[in-house]
């Protein structure tokens, strides 16, 4: 199954106590509260706050609550990584037990399948692009390609060697205007984003906290961020736009949100208030330490 494939690629086959990463939770408390969470999730208490209240009612110490329910992962993440807990299908963000026991496979075999899928759907791309997207070292990706015998094809663009599987669309056409959602796969899918953005524009597309903003591509190049609040569609330019470009972007926005009677407004970065500083205290201690260093 897909669940078994994803879990196998992560390789967390051991119990919670065998491969424990901490989160500030005493080892002696891990399995006890994992059992409580699974029991409550099986009974239909799937929302994070429901599980939190249930654990407090079961006697969880106050200092454990923010650690076990850490917003960056905590015990819930560790349980999901091992197939002990999953999200329900849909957008409700409710936890439940997996419908069936995950089928485990060798980690390299699972990872090779993801490498294959990447070059089938994201190629042409570099080995480094694939590594960044999947979170594997580049040397491991190259080794998986070699050991799995993946028949990668190659093409060179601006002196960069790119790889892909299957056939390329010989009639590919760059759309005049595209609205990309936040965390869009086009942005996440590549380490080198030269395909659609200038290097100096990258800070307008992603920030140091890992947020990927909704952006507008005009004639294949990133030029602005967009935000819809109520009926107002705000376009924040980080590349100077001609009136022709603005008209095309506004028209595309009206088609995209047809029926909502939106008002489109353009502004520049200088028109925005200064961003609030990122609160490092919300990070796990390990990440906070590396950020401060």
Where are these regions (language model features)?
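Long, low-complexity intrinsically disordered regions
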Residues: 1-187, 191-193, 198-293
């Amino acid at each position: 199954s897909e669940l078994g494939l994803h879990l196998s690629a992560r390789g967390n086959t051991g119990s919670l106590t065998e491969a424990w990463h901490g989160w500030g939770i005493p080892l002696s408390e891990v399995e006890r509260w994992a059992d409580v969470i699974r029991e409550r999730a099986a009974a239909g208490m799937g929302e994070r706050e429901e599980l939190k209240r249930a654990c407090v009612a079961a006697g969880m110490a106050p200092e454990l609550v923010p650690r076990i329910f850490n917003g960056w992962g905590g015990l819930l993440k560790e349980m999901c990584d091992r197939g002990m807990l999953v999200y329900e299908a849909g957008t409700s963000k409710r936890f439940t037990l997996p419908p069936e026991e995950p089928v485990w496979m060798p980690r390299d075999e699972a990872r090779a399948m993801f490498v294959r899928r990447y070059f089938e759907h994201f190629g042409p791309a570099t080995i480094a692009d694939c590594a960044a997207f999947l979170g594997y070292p580049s040397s491991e990706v190259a080794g998986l390609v070699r050991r799995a015998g993946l028949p990668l094809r190659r093409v060179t663009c601006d002196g960069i060697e790119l790889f892909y599987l299957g056939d390329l669309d010989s009639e590919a056409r760059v759309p005049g205007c595209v609205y990309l959602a936040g965390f869009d796969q086009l942005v996440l899918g590549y380490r080198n984003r030269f395909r659609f953005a200038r290097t100096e524009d990258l800070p307008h597309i992603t920030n140091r906290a890992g947020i990927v903003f909704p952006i507008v591509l005009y004639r294949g190049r990133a030029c602005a961020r967009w935000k819809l609040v109520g009926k107002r569609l705000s376009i924040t330019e980080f590349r100077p736009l001609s009136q022709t470009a603005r008209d095309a972007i506004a028209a595309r926005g009206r088609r995209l949100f047809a029926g909502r009677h939106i008002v489109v407004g353009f502004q520049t970065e200088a028109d925005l208030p200064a961003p609030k500083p990122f609160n490092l205290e919300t990070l796990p201690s390990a990440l906070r330490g590396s950020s401060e260093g």
